[in-house]
């Protein structure tokens, strides 16, 4: 039976009870508007942990002033129904004031914030100033509240996963950060709550992002690191030709977000892309290792 919890005290009471019974705890953190990608994380936690908690919180401090906080989809009752079907044990759905009692609504208003340097200086970091600081500040707080053993993150938002993994390691937290494969629609589009922003014409274009990134990853797998510059340029040109409004970046990094330098094994590389299409900002990535020998 799904327990719906709204206060920090209720969550801590529940996790203490589970701990006393010797249960392990897995946590999936979301902003709601759940889809099969989120639910696959619940399934992964269910397989590996005795108890599963999902957090459902649209975190205001990870949004910039001109971003989509106000229109981000909120489907709480549908989310609860989906979690009951997946046999999730508890959902923590706090009010904004519960997590930020001082009235913080932007990262620059937060008294104590968590900054992961280096990993947030590439890819989405420069394009969304303060975004990752807002993510890590809220996630660290949730980890302290939920007291889980394992936390599960999708590889679609790979930079977010890498940043959270680094934060947990740097803080010495006794939590394992578990990456999970990106869930995709039948045409290859990565599942995302923001896909609802796309109209039918844009939805037909959107899968071409992953297709282009995969082709680039395959070329790097076949021809090596020396073709990265030419390959990323060609991907960006292809995406614009296919109808995307803006290509924010197409870049290649290692799985730990290090640079692709001479001597780096191609199997360690990923091709990352971010584009704008209508009112949606779409992210995806392709692992070169998946294309080796393909």
From Swiss-Prot:
<dbReference type="InterPro" id="IPR042176">
    <property type="entry name" value="Pantoate_ligase_C"/>
</dbReference>
<keyword id="KW-0436">Ligase</keyword>
<feature type="binding site">
    <location>
        <begin position="154"/>
        <end position="157"/>
    </location>
    <ligand>
        <name>ATP</name>
    </ligand>
</feature>
<keyword id="KW-0566">Pantothenate biosynthesis</keyword>
<keyword id="KW-0547">Nucleotide-binding</keyword>
<comment type="similarity">
    <text>Belongs to the pantothenate synthetase family.</text>
</comment>
<comment type="subunit">
    <text>Homodimer.</text>
</comment>
<dbReference type="GO" id="GO:0005524">
    <property type="term" value="F:ATP binding"/>
</dbReference>
<feature type="active site" description="Proton donor">
    <location>
        <position position="38"/>
    </location>
</feature>
<dbReference type="InterPro" id="IPR004821">
    <property type="entry name" value="Cyt_trans-like"/>
</dbReference>
<feature type="binding site">
    <location>
        <begin position="191"/>
        <end position="194"/>
    </location>
    <ligand>
        <name>ATP</name>
    </ligand>
</feature>
<feature type="binding site">
    <location>
        <position position="62"/>
    </location>
    <ligand>
        <name>(R)-pantoate</name>
    </ligand>
</feature>
<feature type="binding site">
    <location>
        <position position="62"/>
    </location>
    <ligand>
        <name>beta-alanine</name>
    </ligand>
</feature>
<feature type="binding site">
    <location>
        <begin position="31"/>
        <end position="38"/>
    </location>
    <ligand>
        <name>ATP</name>
    </ligand>
</feature>
<dbReference type="Pfam" id="PF02569">
    <property type="entry name" value="Pantoate_ligase"/>
</dbReference>
<comment type="function">
    <text>Catalyzes the condensation of pantoate with beta-alanine in an ATP-dependent reaction via a pantoyl-adenylate intermediate.</text>
</comment>
<dbReference type="InterPro" id="IPR003721">
    <property type="entry name" value="Pantoate_ligase"/>
</dbReference>
<dbReference type="GO" id="GO:0004592">
    <property type="term" value="F:pantoate-beta-alanine ligase activity"/>
</dbReference>
<protein>
    <recommendedName>
        <fullName>Pantothenate synthetase 3</fullName>
        <ecNumber>6.3.2.1</ecNumber>
    </recommendedName>
</protein>
<dbReference type="GO" id="GO:0005829">
    <property type="term" value="C:cytosol"/>
</dbReference>
<comment type="pathway">
    <text>Cofactor biosynthesis; (R)-pantothenate biosynthesis; (R)-pantothenate from (R)-pantoate and beta-alanine: step 1/1.</text>
</comment>
<keyword id="KW-0067">ATP-binding</keyword>
<keyword id="KW-0963">Cytoplasm</keyword>
<dbReference type="InterPro" id="IPR014729">
    <property type="entry name" value="Rossmann-like_a/b/a_fold"/>
</dbReference>
<feature type="binding site">
    <location>
        <position position="160"/>
    </location>
    <ligand>
        <name>(R)-pantoate</name>
    </ligand>
</feature>
<dbReference type="GO" id="GO:0015940">
    <property type="term" value="P:pantothenate biosynthetic process"/>
</dbReference>
């Amino acid at each position: 039976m799904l327990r719906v919890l709204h206060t920090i005290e209720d969550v801590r009471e529940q996790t203490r009870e589970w701990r006393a019974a010797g249960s392990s705890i897995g946590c999936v953190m979301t902003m709601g508007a759940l889809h099969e990608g989120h639910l696959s994380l619940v399934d992964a936690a269910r397989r590996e942990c005795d108890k599963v908690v999902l957090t459902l919180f649209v975190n205001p401090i990870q949004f910039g002033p001109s971003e989509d906080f106000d229109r981000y989809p909120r489907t709480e009752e549908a989310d609860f129904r989906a979690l009951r079907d997946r046999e999730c044990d508890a959902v923590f759905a706090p009010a904004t004031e519960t997590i930020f009692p001082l009235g913080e609504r932007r990262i620059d208003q937060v008294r104590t914030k968590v900054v992961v340097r280096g990993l947030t200086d590439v890819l989405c970091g420069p394009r969304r100033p303060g975004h990752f600081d807002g993510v890590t500040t809220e996630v660290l707080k949730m980890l302290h509240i939920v007291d889980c053993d394992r936390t599960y993150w999708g590889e679609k938002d790979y930079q977010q996963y890498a940043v959270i993994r680094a934060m947990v390691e740097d803080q010495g937290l006794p939590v394992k950060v578990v990456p999970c494969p990106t869930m995709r629609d039948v045409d290859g589009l990565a599942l995302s709550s923001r896909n609802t922003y796309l109209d039918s014409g844009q939805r037909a274009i959107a899968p071409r992002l992953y297709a282009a990134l995969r082709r680039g990853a395959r070329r790097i797998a076949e021809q090596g690191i020396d073709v990265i510059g030419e390959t990323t340029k060609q991907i960006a040109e292809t995406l614009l030709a296919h109808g995307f409004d803006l290509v924010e970046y197409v870049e290649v990094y290692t799985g730990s977000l290090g640079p692709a330098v001479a001597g780096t094994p191609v199997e360690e590389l990923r091709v990352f892309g971010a584009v704008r299409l209508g009112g949606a900002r779409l992210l995806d990535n392709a692992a070169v290792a998946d294309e080796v020998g393909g």
